C-alpha cells in the first residue's frame, strides 16, 4: 500500500522534478550568479547618476515637488532594507553635489544611467539566448522613455493615492486602505518584473510565463527584504567589523542579492516555455512512434 502511494507520488512529481532539473541546468549554463555580479557592479556605479537624473526630472516639473519627496521616501522605505535611512542621507548628498555639475557632467550622468539599462538589456537577452538586436536608435528611445516616463508615472500614481486618501469618504475605509497599502510594494514589484520580462527581451515571451516568473521574483524580493533586515538586526557582524562604513558592504550585498532574484525570475520565465516545448516534442515523438 505504502509502496503504491510512493510510486504515485513519484509519478505526479516527475514533471516538477524534470522542470527543476532543467531550471538548474539553465542557471548553471547562463552563469546566473556571475551575471548578477556584473549587474550589481554596474548598478553601484550608476546608482547616484540614475537617481540624480530621476529627481532632476521631478525638479523640472514644479507640480511634482511634493510627489518627489513621497516617491523618495517610498523607494528607500520599500526597496532598501534596514539601512535605508543611512543610505538615503549619503545618496542625497551625492545628488546635491551632482546638481552643481556643468552641462558636460550632466550628460555624463545621463550616459552612465543609460549604460545600466543597456547592461540589463544585455543580461536578459543572454538568459533568453536571443540573438536578435534592436536598432540603436530604437534602443536609446526605449531606455530614455523608461528613464523619463517611469518616474513620472510612479509619481503620478503616488499623487493620485495621496489625493484619494485625503477624501472624506476614504477615511471610512481605513482598514481596507491599510490592507491594500500593505501589499502595494508586492504588487508594484510584481508589475515591474512582469514588464521587465515582457518588454526587454528581443524575442516573444508568453504572457503567462512572464506573470509566473515575475510573481516568484516579487515574492522572493519582498521576503528577501524582510530576511535581510532580520539578519542585519540579529547578527550585526558588519557593524562590529566595519563600524561607520558598514553601510557600504550591506548595500553591496543587497544589490547583488536583488539582481540574483531578478535573474532567477527571468530563468524561471524562460524555463517554463522551454519545458513546455520539450514536453510537446516528446509527446509528438511518442505519437509518431505509435
Curated annotation (Swiss-Prot):
<keyword id="KW-0472">Membrane</keyword>
<dbReference type="Pfam" id="PF03631">
    <property type="entry name" value="Virul_fac_BrkB"/>
</dbReference>
<keyword id="KW-1133">Transmembrane helix</keyword>
<comment type="similarity">
    <text>Belongs to the UPF0761 family.</text>
</comment>
<dbReference type="GO" id="GO:0005886">
    <property type="term" value="C:plasma membrane"/>
</dbReference>
<feature type="transmembrane region" description="Helical">
    <location>
        <begin position="44"/>
        <end position="64"/>
    </location>
</feature>
<protein>
    <recommendedName>
        <fullName>UPF0761 membrane protein CKO_03126</fullName>
    </recommendedName>
</protein>
<feature type="transmembrane region" description="Helical">
    <location>
        <begin position="140"/>
        <end position="160"/>
    </location>
</feature>
<feature type="transmembrane region" description="Helical">
    <location>
        <begin position="104"/>
        <end position="124"/>
    </location>
</feature>
<dbReference type="InterPro" id="IPR017039">
    <property type="entry name" value="Virul_fac_BrkB"/>
</dbReference>
<feature type="transmembrane region" description="Helical">
    <location>
        <begin position="183"/>
        <end position="203"/>
    </location>
</feature>
<feature type="transmembrane region" description="Helical">
    <location>
        <begin position="210"/>
        <end position="230"/>
    </location>
</feature>
<keyword id="KW-0997">Cell inner membrane</keyword>
<keyword id="KW-1003">Cell membrane</keyword>
<keyword id="KW-0812">Transmembrane</keyword>
<feature type="transmembrane region" description="Helical">
    <location>
        <begin position="244"/>
        <end position="264"/>
    </location>
</feature>
<dbReference type="InterPro" id="IPR023679">
    <property type="entry name" value="UPF0761_bac"/>
</dbReference>
